[in-house]
Protein backbone atom coordinates (compact mmCIF):
# COMPACT_ATOMS: atom_id res chain seq x y z
CA UNK A 1 0.00 0.00 0.00
CA UNK A 2 2.73 2.41 -1.00
CA UNK A 3 4.48 2.44 2.40
CA UNK A 4 1.44 3.47 4.45
CA UNK A 5 1.74 2.28 8.04
CA UNK A 6 0.19 3.17 11.37
CA UNK A 7 3.28 5.27 12.07
CA UNK A 8 2.78 7.44 8.98
CA UNK A 9 -0.75 8.67 9.77
CA UNK A 10 -2.20 10.46 12.79
CA UNK A 11 -5.44 8.52 12.55
CA UNK A 12 -6.24 4.93 13.49
CA UNK A 13 -5.04 2.29 10.99
CA UNK A 14 -5.48 -1.43 11.60
CA UNK A 15 -5.33 -4.58 9.49
CA UNK A 16 -7.83 -7.46 9.31
CA UNK A 17 -10.62 -5.69 11.18
CA UNK A 18 -13.85 -7.68 11.47
CA UNK A 19 -16.62 -5.55 9.98
CA UNK A 20 -19.43 -7.06 12.03
CA UNK A 21 -18.69 -4.53 14.77
CA UNK A 22 -18.78 -1.65 12.26
CA UNK A 23 -22.10 -2.36 10.49
CA UNK A 24 -25.62 -1.94 11.79
CA UNK A 25 -26.55 -5.52 10.80
CA UNK A 26 -23.71 -6.77 13.03
CA UNK A 27 -22.51 -9.17 10.34
CA UNK A 28 -19.54 -9.21 7.98
CA UNK A 29 -16.05 -10.59 7.51
CA UNK A 30 -12.73 -8.78 7.87
CA UNK A 31 -11.59 -5.67 6.06
CA UNK A 32 -8.03 -5.87 4.81
CA UNK A 33 -7.43 -2.44 6.39
CA UNK A 34 -9.56 0.01 8.31
CA UNK A 35 -8.51 3.63 8.69
CA UNK A 36 -10.18 6.29 10.82
CA UNK A 37 -8.63 9.70 10.11
CA UNK A 38 -7.67 12.05 12.90
CA UNK A 39 -9.21 14.93 10.96
CA UNK A 40 -9.78 16.19 7.44
CA UNK A 41 -6.12 17.10 6.83
CA UNK A 42 -5.02 13.64 7.95
CA UNK A 43 -7.52 12.09 5.53
CA UNK A 44 -6.25 14.14 2.58
CA UNK A 45 -2.65 13.23 3.44
CA UNK A 46 -3.60 9.54 3.67
CA UNK A 47 -5.28 9.64 0.25
CA UNK A 48 -2.11 11.08 -1.29
CA UNK A 49 -0.17 7.95 -0.31
CA UNK A 50 -2.65 5.45 -1.76
CA UNK A 51 -2.07 3.63 -5.05
CA UNK A 52 -4.45 4.83 -7.75
CA UNK A 53 -6.06 1.38 -7.97
CA UNK A 54 -6.53 0.89 -4.22
CA UNK A 55 -10.07 -0.44 -3.52
CA UNK A 56 -11.80 1.96 -1.13
CA UNK A 57 -15.01 1.74 0.87
CA UNK A 58 -16.10 4.86 2.72
CA UNK A 59 -17.98 3.95 5.88
CA UNK A 60 -20.38 6.05 7.91
CA UNK A 61 -22.56 4.39 10.53
CA UNK A 62 -22.61 1.09 8.65
CA UNK A 63 -26.29 1.22 7.76
CA UNK A 64 -27.56 0.28 4.30
CA UNK A 65 -24.48 -1.94 3.96
CA UNK A 66 -23.95 -5.71 3.84
CA UNK A 67 -20.35 -6.91 4.08
CA UNK A 68 -20.10 -10.53 3.00
CA UNK A 69 -18.55 -13.12 5.32
CA UNK A 70 -15.34 -13.48 3.29
CA UNK A 71 -14.53 -9.84 3.92
CA UNK A 72 -13.31 -7.07 1.64
CA UNK A 73 -9.96 -6.24 0.10
CA UNK A 74 -8.45 -2.78 0.12
CA UNK A 75 -9.10 -0.05 2.66
CA UNK A 76 -12.21 0.96 4.57
CA UNK A 77 -12.21 4.65 5.54
CA UNK A 78 -14.43 5.29 8.56
CA UNK A 79 -15.51 8.93 8.76
CA UNK A 80 -18.42 8.90 11.23
CA UNK A 81 -17.63 11.14 14.17
CA UNK A 82 -14.50 12.50 12.45
CA UNK A 83 -15.78 14.72 9.65
CA UNK A 84 -18.35 16.04 12.09
CA UNK A 85 -18.61 19.82 11.71
CA UNK A 86 -21.80 21.76 10.97
CA UNK A 87 -21.89 25.51 10.36
CA UNK A 88 -24.62 27.95 9.49
CA UNK A 89 -23.09 30.00 6.69
CA UNK A 90 -25.97 32.36 5.81
CA UNK A 91 -29.58 32.90 6.86
CA UNK A 92 -30.66 29.84 4.89
CA UNK A 93 -27.42 27.96 4.14
CA UNK A 94 -25.78 25.22 6.20
CA UNK A 95 -22.39 23.59 5.55
CA UNK A 96 -22.05 20.06 6.92
CA UNK A 97 -19.29 17.46 6.78
CA UNK A 98 -19.93 13.92 5.57
CA UNK A 99 -19.39 12.18 8.91
CA UNK A 100 -22.24 14.00 10.64
CA UNK A 101 -25.24 11.78 11.31
CA UNK A 102 -28.44 12.67 9.48
CA UNK A 103 -30.23 12.87 12.83
CA UNK A 104 -27.69 15.37 14.19
CA UNK A 105 -28.05 17.53 11.07
CA UNK A 106 -31.85 17.51 11.31
CA UNK A 107 -31.76 18.58 14.96
CA UNK A 108 -29.18 21.30 14.29
CA UNK A 109 -31.32 22.82 11.54
CA UNK A 110 -34.43 22.67 13.70
CA UNK A 111 -32.71 24.44 16.60
CA UNK A 112 -31.50 27.12 14.19
CA UNK A 113 -35.05 27.73 12.96
CA UNK A 114 -34.37 26.24 9.53
CA UNK A 115 -37.01 24.08 7.86
CA UNK A 116 -36.72 21.34 5.25
CA UNK A 117 -34.30 18.91 6.90
CA UNK A 118 -36.70 17.37 9.42
CA UNK A 119 -37.09 14.18 7.37
CA UNK A 120 -33.39 13.42 7.88
CA UNK A 121 -34.04 12.63 11.54
CA UNK A 122 -35.49 9.29 10.45
CA UNK A 123 -32.49 8.20 8.36
CA UNK A 124 -30.03 5.95 10.26
CA UNK A 125 -26.85 7.03 8.51
CA UNK A 126 -24.43 9.87 7.84
CA UNK A 127 -24.58 12.82 5.48
CA UNK A 128 -21.96 11.15 3.28
CA UNK A 129 -24.10 8.06 2.86
CA UNK A 130 -27.20 10.17 2.26
CA UNK A 131 -25.38 12.05 -0.49
CA UNK A 132 -24.08 8.86 -2.09
CA UNK A 133 -27.53 7.29 -2.46
CA UNK A 134 -29.89 10.28 -2.35
CA UNK A 135 -31.38 8.96 0.86
CA UNK A 136 -34.91 9.94 1.69
CA UNK A 137 -37.75 9.51 4.14
CA UNK A 138 -41.20 10.94 4.79
CA UNK A 139 -41.36 12.48 1.31
CA UNK A 140 -38.02 14.30 1.42
CA UNK A 141 -34.73 13.45 -0.32
CA UNK A 142 -31.18 14.59 0.36
CA UNK A 143 -30.32 16.15 -2.98
CA UNK A 144 -33.38 18.43 -2.89
CA UNK A 145 -31.38 20.44 -0.33
CA UNK A 146 -27.91 20.38 -1.94
CA UNK A 147 -26.43 23.50 -3.53
CA UNK A 148 -22.80 22.27 -3.63
CA UNK A 149 -20.59 19.43 -2.43
CA UNK A 150 -16.94 19.04 -1.56
CA UNK A 151 -15.29 15.84 -2.77
CA UNK A 152 -11.91 14.11 -2.56
CA UNK A 153 -10.25 11.50 -4.73
CA UNK A 154 -7.31 9.12 -4.72
CA UNK A 155 -4.18 11.24 -4.65
CA UNK A 156 -5.74 13.70 -2.22
CA UNK A 157 -7.21 15.95 -4.89
CA UNK A 158 -10.26 17.76 -3.55
CA UNK A 159 -12.65 20.24 -5.10
CA UNK A 160 -16.12 21.75 -4.99
CA UNK A 161 -18.80 20.46 -7.34
CA UNK A 162 -22.34 21.57 -8.19
CA UNK A 163 -25.50 19.44 -8.34
CA UNK A 164 -25.67 19.69 -12.14
CA UNK A 165 -22.45 17.67 -12.31
CA UNK A 166 -24.35 14.65 -10.96
CA UNK A 167 -27.16 12.46 -12.25
CA UNK A 168 -29.52 12.15 -9.30
CA UNK A 169 -32.61 9.96 -9.13
CA UNK A 170 -34.48 7.81 -6.63
CA UNK A 171 -31.82 6.22 -4.38
CA UNK A 172 -29.14 6.71 -7.06
CA UNK A 173 -26.40 9.27 -7.58
CA UNK A 174 -23.90 9.11 -10.44
CA UNK A 175 -20.96 11.48 -10.74
CA UNK A 176 -17.22 11.51 -11.40
CA UNK A 177 -15.66 8.12 -10.61
CA UNK A 178 -13.32 7.55 -7.68
CA UNK A 179 -14.48 10.61 -5.79
CA UNK A 180 -16.04 10.65 -2.34
CA UNK A 181 -18.05 13.25 -0.46
CA UNK A 182 -16.33 15.32 2.22
CA UNK A 183 -19.05 17.91 2.86
CA UNK A 184 -22.16 19.54 1.45
CA UNK A 185 -23.73 22.96 1.33
CA UNK A 186 -27.50 22.85 1.88
CA UNK A 187 -30.19 25.44 1.33
CA UNK A 188 -33.15 25.44 3.70
CA UNK A 189 -35.99 27.83 4.48
CA UNK A 190 -36.48 30.10 7.47
CA UNK A 191 -39.09 28.90 9.90
CA UNK A 192 -40.07 28.43 13.51
CA UNK A 193 -37.62 26.40 15.61
CA UNK A 194 -40.29 25.02 17.93
CA UNK A 195 -42.45 23.87 15.02
CA UNK A 196 -39.45 22.20 13.36
CA UNK A 197 -38.53 20.35 16.55
CA UNK A 198 -42.13 19.23 17.03
CA UNK A 199 -42.11 17.91 13.45
CA UNK A 200 -38.98 15.88 14.17
CA UNK A 201 -40.55 14.37 17.28
CA UNK A 202 -43.67 13.48 15.31
CA UNK A 203 -41.67 11.81 12.53
CA UNK A 204 -39.58 9.84 15.02
CA UNK A 205 -42.71 8.61 16.81
CA UNK A 206 -44.06 7.51 13.45
CA UNK A 207 -40.80 5.72 12.59
CA UNK A 208 -40.40 4.10 16.00
CA UNK A 209 -43.95 2.83 15.90
CA UNK A 210 -43.47 0.75 12.76
CA UNK A 211 -39.74 -0.05 12.43
CA UNK A 212 -37.59 -2.58 14.33
CA UNK A 213 -35.32 0.03 15.88
CA UNK A 214 -34.23 -2.22 18.78
CA UNK A 215 -32.86 -5.02 16.59
CA UNK A 216 -29.76 -5.03 14.35
CA UNK A 217 -30.87 -4.06 10.86
CA UNK A 218 -29.68 -1.88 7.99
CA UNK A 219 -32.72 0.24 7.22
CA UNK A 220 -34.97 -0.42 4.24
CA UNK A 221 -33.79 -3.43 2.24
CA UNK A 222 -35.55 -2.75 -1.09
CA UNK A 223 -36.34 0.38 -3.05
CA UNK A 224 -40.02 1.15 -3.36
CA UNK A 225 -41.27 0.26 -6.85
CA UNK A 226 -43.14 2.85 -8.84
CA UNK A 227 -46.49 3.68 -7.27
CA UNK A 228 -46.22 1.00 -4.57
CA UNK A 229 -44.36 0.10 -1.37
CA UNK A 230 -41.87 -2.74 -1.08
CA UNK A 231 -43.04 -3.47 2.46
CA UNK A 232 -46.67 -3.80 1.37
CA UNK A 233 -45.73 -6.24 -1.41
CA UNK A 234 -43.56 -8.36 0.88
CA UNK A 235 -46.28 -8.50 3.52
CA UNK A 236 -48.94 -9.32 0.90
CA UNK A 237 -46.83 -12.32 -0.12
CA UNK A 238 -46.98 -13.62 3.44
CA UNK A 239 -43.29 -13.08 4.15
CA UNK A 240 -43.39 -11.25 7.47
CA UNK A 241 -41.45 -13.38 9.94
CA UNK A 242 -39.82 -15.51 7.23
CA UNK A 243 -36.27 -16.46 8.15
CA UNK A 244 -33.08 -18.07 6.93
CA UNK A 245 -30.60 -18.90 9.67
CA UNK A 246 -30.42 -15.94 12.02
CA UNK A 247 -31.88 -13.45 9.52
CA UNK A 248 -35.60 -12.71 9.64
CA UNK A 249 -38.08 -10.45 7.85
CA UNK A 250 -39.28 -8.10 10.56
CA UNK A 251 -42.80 -8.55 11.85
CA UNK A 252 -42.98 -4.80 12.46
CA UNK A 253 -42.08 -3.74 8.90
CA UNK A 254 -41.70 -6.20 6.05
CA UNK A 255 -39.07 -4.12 4.24
CA UNK A 256 -36.64 -4.64 7.12
CA UNK A 257 -34.52 -7.72 7.75
CA UNK A 258 -33.24 -8.14 11.30
CA UNK A 259 -30.40 -10.11 12.80
CA UNK A 260 -31.97 -12.21 15.55
CA UNK A 261 -28.59 -12.68 17.19
CA UNK A 262 -26.60 -15.24 15.24
CA UNK A 263 -27.06 -14.32 11.58
CA UNK A 264 -24.27 -14.49 9.04
CA UNK A 265 -24.01 -12.15 6.08
CA UNK A 266 -24.86 -15.16 3.91
CA UNK A 267 -28.12 -15.64 5.86
CA UNK A 268 -29.06 -12.02 5.20
CA UNK A 269 -28.14 -12.12 1.51
CA UNK A 270 -29.95 -15.40 0.90
CA UNK A 271 -33.07 -14.03 2.60
CA UNK A 272 -32.92 -10.88 0.46
CA UNK A 273 -32.70 -13.04 -2.67
CA UNK A 274 -35.51 -15.34 -1.54
CA UNK A 275 -37.84 -12.43 -0.72
CA UNK A 276 -37.16 -10.83 -4.12
CA UNK A 277 -37.78 -14.12 -5.94
CA UNK A 278 -41.01 -14.75 -4.03
CA UNK A 279 -42.40 -11.27 -4.70
CA UNK A 280 -41.48 -11.56 -8.39
CA UNK A 281 -43.23 -14.92 -8.63
CA UNK A 282 -46.37 -14.02 -6.67
CA UNK A 283 -46.82 -10.31 -7.44
CA UNK A 284 -44.97 -9.95 -10.73
CA UNK A 285 -42.85 -7.10 -9.36
CA UNK A 286 -39.05 -7.03 -9.44
CA UNK A 287 -37.76 -5.56 -6.19
CA UNK A 288 -34.38 -3.83 -6.38
CA UNK A 289 -32.19 -3.95 -3.25
CA UNK A 290 -31.45 -0.60 -1.66
CA UNK A 291 -28.72 -2.21 0.42
CA UNK A 292 -25.13 -1.94 -0.85
CA UNK A 293 -23.52 -5.42 -0.84
CA UNK A 294 -19.73 -5.67 -0.84
CA UNK A 295 -17.00 -8.25 -0.35
CA UNK A 296 -16.58 -11.94 -1.01
CA UNK A 297 -18.53 -14.95 0.25
CA UNK A 298 -16.87 -17.11 2.91
UniProtKB/Swiss-Prot annotation:
Gene that specifies this protein: murB
Domain FAD-binding PCMH-type: 27-206
GO cellular component: cytosol
EC number: 1.3.1.98
Transmembrane segments: none
Taxon lineage: Bacteria, Pseudomonadati, Pseudomonadota, Gammaproteobacteria, Chromatiales
PANTHER family linked to this entry: UDP-N-ACETYLENOLPYRUVOYLGLUCOSAMINE REDUCTASE
Cofactors that this protein relies on: FAD
Identification of the protein by name: UDP-N-acetylenolpyruvoylglucosamine reductase
Enzyme superclass (EC): oxidoreductase
One of the protein's GO biological processes: regulation of cell shape
Active-site residues, record numbering mapped to chain: 171, 220 (proton donor), 290
